[in-house]
Structure formats: C-alpha cells, structure tokens
From Swiss-Prot:
Reactions this protein catalyses: NAD(+) + ATP = ADP + NADP(+) + H(+)
Gene3D superfamilies per the UniProt record, alphabetical: Probable inorganic polyphosphate/atp-NAD kinase, domain 1, Probable inorganic polyphosphate/atp-NAD kinase, domain 2
Any one GO molecular function term: metal ion binding
InterPro entries, sorted: ATP-NAD_kinase_N, ATP-NAD_kinase_PpnK-typ_C, NAD/diacylglycerol_kinase_sf, NADK
GO cellular component, one term: cytoplasm
Biological role: Involved in the regulation of the intracellular balance of NAD and NADP, and is a key enzyme in the biosynthesis of NADP. Catalyzes specifically the phosphorylation on 2'-hydroxyl of the adenosine moiety of NAD to yield NADP.
The protein's required cofactors: a divalent metal cation
Residues that coordinate or bind NAD(+): D62, G63, K67, N143, D144, K173, D175
Protein source organism: Prochlorococcus marinus subsp. pastoris (strain CCMP1986 / NIES-2087 / MED4)
Chief subcellular location: cytoplasm
Keywords assigned: ATP-binding, Cytoplasm, Kinase, NAD, NADP, Nucleotide-binding, Transferase
Gene transcribed to yield this protein: nadK1
Annotated EC: 2.7.1.23
Protein name: NAD kinase 1
Pfam families: NAD_kinase, NAD_kinase_C
Length: 299
C-alpha cells in the first residue's frame, strides 16, 4: 500500500506514521510520501514504480485527494481517503476509522463498496488561421475545469462561447465559466451558485461565474456530451484554464478546448458504515433542516 499525506500538515504527517505502523504490524507492505512529492511530480512517481500498490491511502482534505486522484488517472488503483487536516472533506471517510484501526478489519472483511467517480478530460487545441488543428495540451480533472481572466490587477469581462455536441448553445459574458463533474458540484461550482448534483448521477454542470445576463443560468447535461469552449474576446485579452484549483495554461483568442468524460473513472473506497451522502451535506454545509436526522445519526 502507498500512503500519501498532505504536505505542510503536521497532523497529516503524524497520522501517516501511525497508519504506516498499523499496516506494518500486520505484515502489510507500505510506504509514505508527501502530496507535494518531488516538486509536485506525483504522476512521475507512479510511472517509475516497478510494481504498483494495490491501494492508495490518502490522508488530508479534498485537495490532497484531488491531487492523488489526478496522479492516478492512468492506473486502476482504488483510493481510500481520510479527512486529516482538511476543511470540508466531501471525498473522505471519517478519521475515526483510521485511528481506532477499524479500517483494517473493514478492508479484510470487504465491508465497503467501490464508488466510481467520473472524471473530466480537456484537450486544448490551437486553431490559428492557415494552420492545421493540433492539440497543445491535455488535462484530466476529478472536480472541474474553469476559465478565468489572466489579469490580476483588474477584473475584465470575459466572453466565452460554448458548444454542446457540435451545437452552439450560448455566449457567456462575465467573470468566467465552470465545467464540473457531479463530484465537483460541491466545490467551486457550488460556491458560484451552481446546483448540488448527487455523485451517482452521470452529468456535467455548466456554470457561468457572475454572468452579466440574468438569462445565463447553470445547466446540467449528460456526461456523454462533448463540450467545446471558445475564447471570443473582442479586446484580445487572454483567459487562463484551471483544473481542480490548479493553474494549467493560458487560452489565447484562437485556441479552444474540448471537454468530455474520461474513460476510466476514479475508484474510491466507501465504507458500509460511513454516513450517507445527505448526512454528509447536513454536516459539511451546516444545514438547519430536520435536526432529528442528526440525532438519529448519533444514536
């Protein structure tokens, strides 16, 4: 097994030492590495391994899980994550399973399910006049891709055209645009006023950021769709592409992006004894609904 723990977190580091010791006491081979391993070259770590681990245990928040999941995009390795030093922790199991060592018995007895989370793939194309179409870069994301201005000193209006399945759908004017998976609907998209989508629903959320038109609303589409994003700035300003909170590259006026679903989903282990998705929303978002749900969960 491989243990990836959140960098710059003493709590996560200590938890990784505890986890490593727990595994070795049961004669389970394991190794610890930081999430910022070798200057954020986590992908290269797996590429250079002689033998891949059977399981990756992630200790941190959702950001650490996203980084680990993106590094594993080409490998069929499940992820078991615990919320150690993170904030919301939508993608993680409760840390009690780790510290009371019950996670070992749960794994041995197979008292868990594999939760398949669909990912996003983005190809960035150069479409300069009189040049052959070519891919400049390719990226994968578990939560989302989004497009925002390159400018840091001012906040200009961006103009972004969107096509769905070869059909021009809209031109958004505003601060930017988010394309999220169902998993990512509780991340940046939710903060920008987008809908919460259950992770079992195979969908994309297209959500404009602070649009200048009241008619520009978030929409949910099947994740079998092909989404094309074009920069149509009249002022020659450039837009930056982001994935899962990390900068990718600058999208120039004649460039465009094709976004679709990744063939291989992310495998995440969910314990049978874990709280439900809806209880997670109540706890993480501090919903003030029927308090009996919280009371029943505590009994």
């Amino acid at each position: 097994m491989l243990i990836i723990y959140r960098s710059n977190s003493l709590t996560a580091k200590e938890a990784s030492i505890f986890c490593n010791k727990t595994l070795k006491e049961r004669n389970i081979k394991s190794k610890r590495i930081e999430s910022d391993f070798d200057n954020n070259q986590l992908e290269n770590y797996f590429y250079n391994l002689a033998a891949l681990p059977d399981l990756v245990i992630v200790l941190g928040g959702d950001g650490t899980v996203l980084k680990s999941a993106n590094a594993l995009v080409n490998y069929d390795i499940p992820i078991l994550s615990f919320n150690i030093g993170g904030n919301l922790g939508f993608l993680t199991q409760e840390k009690d399973f780790l510290f009371d060592q019950s996670f070992i018995k749960i794994l041995e007895k197979e008292e868990f399910i594999i939760d398949f989370r669909n990912r996003l793939h983005c190809d960035v194309y150069s479409n300069e006049k009189n040049r052959e179409r070519k891919i400049l870069k390719s990226y994968d994301a578990l939560n989302d891709f989004y497009f925002k201005s390159v400018e840091e000193d001012i906040s200009p209006t961006n103009q972004i055209q969107i096509e769905i399945d070869n059909e021009k759908v809209n031109e958004y004017k505003g601060d930017g645009l988010i394309i999220s998976s169902s998993t990512g609907s509780t991340a940046y998209s939710m903060a920008a006023g987008g809908p919460i989508v259950h992770p079992s629903i195979n969908a994309f959320v297209i959500n404009p950021i602070c649009p200048m038109s009241l008619a520009s609303r978030p929409i949910i589409i099947p994740d079998t769709s092909k989404v094309v994003i074009r920069v149509v700035q009249k002022n020659k300003r450039e837009i930056k592409l982001w994935k899962d909170g990390s900068k990718c590259m600058t999208i120039k006026e004649n460039d465009y992006c094709e976004i679709n679903k990744v063939t291989k989903p992310c495998k995440m282990i969910k314990f049978n004894k874990s709280i439900s998705y809806y209880i997670t929303l109540i706890k993480k978002l501090d919903w003030k609904g029927d308090l009996s749900l919280k009371n029943n969960q505590n009994n």
